[in-house]
From Swiss-Prot:
CC per GO annotation: cytoplasm
Positions of the catalytic residues: 94 (proton donor/acceptor), 156 (schiff-base intermediate with acetaldehyde), 185 (proton donor/acceptor)
The protein's name in its UniProt record: Deoxyribose-phosphate aldolase
Principal cellular location given in the protein's record: cytoplasm
Catalytic activity: 2-deoxy-D-ribose 5-phosphate = D-glyceraldehyde 3-phosphate + acetaldehyde
Localization (cell): Cytoplasm
Key word Cytoplasm present: yes
Gene this chain is encoded by: deoC
Transmembrane segments: none
EC primary class: lyase
Gene3D superfamilies, per the entry: Aldolase class I (3.20.20.70)
Family classification: Belongs to the DeoC/FbaB aldolase family. DeoC type 1 subfamily.
């Protein structure tokens, strides 16, 4: 199989969301993203402005997270966070859905929450994290149906801060429900180039990982 490394690198959100991340680490993240041609860097809101500065003059976008990592904030809080992040220069917002409401089957609440946040995005792209490791297969299907009904751009598997990351089953279920109507981001736990390539073949459009450099270097040796 012919592997287009440049194309795959441009599917990566190069991620550093650890609570102890330092400014020097964010600068390194941004430099790697420029060097490898990653699509974006994903950083906590505090580092949006620094990342914008480090990426100045490049095509790499800034992605951030809201309601992260538990999703348990009120809609009003998530909307405020979103507006603040967009004002500070974020191009993409990865929100965590209210997982309690999702598991209760409250579709109206979840769709409304996503749509209120999308309005606050003011044109920024919105990805909805549903934390698949906490969901049954039926709940994963429901999560995908909710995102399909909403104005979000992407459904995303995981925060990387819960019990597990993306699985092949997650991507298969999402793809079956959303088809080509929404995009899919696989995040967390993608450790090998084989996992990476399988996620993409199953329908992942974007990859969230802190191992971007390692994975691309691995592809070069394939």
């Amino acid at each position: 199989m012919e592997i287009d490394i440049k194309k795959i690198a441009n599917m990566f959100d190069h991620t550093r969301l650890a609570p102890d991340a330092t400014l020097a680490e964010i600068e390194k993240l941004c430099n790697e993203a420029k060097q490898y041609g990653f699509f974006s860097v994903c950083v906590n809101p505090y580092f949006i402005e620094a990342a914008k500065k480090f990426l100045s003059g490049s095509n790499v976008l800034v992605c951030t997270v809201i309601g992260f990592p538990l999703g348990q904030n009120t809609i009003e809080t998530k909307v405020f966070e979103t507006k603040d992040c967009v004002a500070k220069g974020a191009h993409e917002i990865d929100m965590v859905i209210n997982i309690s409401k999702l598991k209760e089957g409250d579709v109206d609440y979840c769709v409304n929450e996503i749509n209120e946040i999308k309005k606050a995005c003011n044109g920024a792209l919105l990805k909805v994290i549903v934390e698949t490791c906490l969901l049954t297969p039926k709940e994963k299907e429901l999560a995908a149906q909710i995102v399909l009904k909403s104005n979000a751009d992407y459904i995303k598997t995981s925060t990387g801060f819960s019990t597990a990351g993306a699985t092949f089953e997650d991507i298969e279920i999402f793809k079956k429900v959303v088809g080509n109507n929404k995009l899919i981001k696989a995040a967390g736990g993608i450790k090998t180039t084989d996992d990476l390539l399988k996620m993409i073949s199953l329908g992942a459009n974007r990859i969230g990982t802190s191992r971007g450099v390692e994975l691309i270097e691995g592809l070069k040796n394939k």
